[in-house]
Amino acid sequence: MWDSSMFLSTLTPKFYVALTGTSSLISGLILIFEWWYFRKYGTSFIEQVSINHISPWINGNDAQSDSSNGSGSSTSSGSSSSSNGGGGGGGGGAGGGGPGAGGGTNSTTTTGTQMPECKVWRNPLNLFRGAEYQRFFWATSKEPLTYYDMNLSAQDHQTFFTCEGDARKEEYEIMQTAWRERNPMQRIKSAHNALEINAECAPAYILLAEEEAMTIMEAEKILKTALKVAEINYRKSQATQHQGAIADGMHRRDTNVLIYIKRRLAMCARKLGKLKEAAKMFRDLTKEIPSIMSVLNIHENLIETLLEMQAYADCHAILAKYDDISLPKSATICYTAALLKARAVADKFSPDIASKRGLSPAEMSAVEAIHRAVEFNPHVPKYLLETKPLILPPEHILKRGDSEALAYAFFHLKHWKQVEGALNLLHCTWEGTFRMLPYPLERGHLFYPYPTCTECADRELLPAFHEVSVYPKKELPFFILFTAGLCSFTALLALLTHQYPEPMGLLAQTVLTWISYPFQLLKERVEAFWPCNLLQQLSRV
């Protein structure tokens, strides 16, 4: 028969050291995997497995059916929220800045009940690849754009500048391939080939202005040529648009090309300092109706140009039109509204005086506007206050995300600096927003709860050398901290026991004596209080 006492007596201290070291190694591996999973997905792997798999298995099939019913209702409520997105709570705050607004690209789907998805939008102020992004690459040897971002741009260009009527037209088929080409030199070569076949291929001029032109003046020159070609094509297709679906599609394509070229020309004028000309072109474009307008958000270009002109009254008029509860919000709208209200009080604002006498109605209105803007996008103040370095903005942004904050601050930081005291007011008040939002992922104040999908989408949009801003700041789960402590403690014990077996044995005996002493004392007290023959007396009763 197997004798356990004899087996235990044959075990040497090396066995216990090896056992402790093995458990420490396993704990360390679990810790490393858990930390990696948390950094990548923002949640504990063991916690997710426990909630999603182990708990339903322990609770039985009823719990599983309840869970599936609950997720079904969550999905339906999410769909309902999506269909009614612009109606309340600030007109759409989460991921896409309000569901139902056209032009967003679905990036990440979530299971939340408030906002079912995150939308990726075109950056209204996106830079020129050749004249701006390429020069940054030459200076730093760092890629300013990610393949994901450029792939979204290729999809946009194919949507805007192609149609069914392009079939069997060699120049347009070349351009369809050119938009998808990863090599910039090959894209430029394809555009030149398309122009050799047809000198009136406007999309080819657009690609050359975006990528081949090394200065803004060169880009403007190419775009002016493209504008003449686009106007000719537009008039031709306008005359034949009623001849069928294909002809109508060609007219829509030519309209998109014309509007895009005019917008880029206006942006060139803005960059070259021709502010009045740029403002007039942007105003004319905002009066257009085609569906591409909801994607380009040209009113944000107009707002930025008016701020550069310090035409604050005109900015108020633009905000009165677009800062509406039924329209999707953006950092430009929210922070421009805060800037204009701060402008009225910022030059005289003092935190010491305000703490003594309280805030005036105008100061209170400015502070509330700042809190509203910070709730919509909490990443912007770090860039405006220059506590975090700016990089070139991406071609696409995620509303309420770090990418939108970068795009806004990159172009609007100087406007905040132009208003005396505005940054000081922002510095003194912006963190007060978080006291009103103890659980931003669960409940918002003026907007939807902050979407959980922003971090993953921003990591796809922003280059690897940029540290993505995360909100709210995630704390390490208790399990990771516990595992780290247990792993370190057991590894230390194994090392000390291996090096100093006798002292560690005496230490272990002393610790066990200290731990057992309270229990021995409690046992003596109980025996002194209760008589030894208590059971006999109870049996007699």
Swiss-Prot record:
Chief location bin: membrane
Disordered: annotated segments: 62-116
According to the UniProt entry, which residue ranges have a biased composition of type Low complexity?
A: 67-83
State the source organism's domain of life: Eukaryota
Cellular component, GO annotation:
membrane
- Describe the family membership recorded for this protein in Swiss-Prot or TrEMBL: Belongs to the ST7 family.
**Protein name per its UniProtKB record:** Protein ST7 homolog
Q: Which organism is it from?
A: Drosophila pseudoobscura pseudoobscura
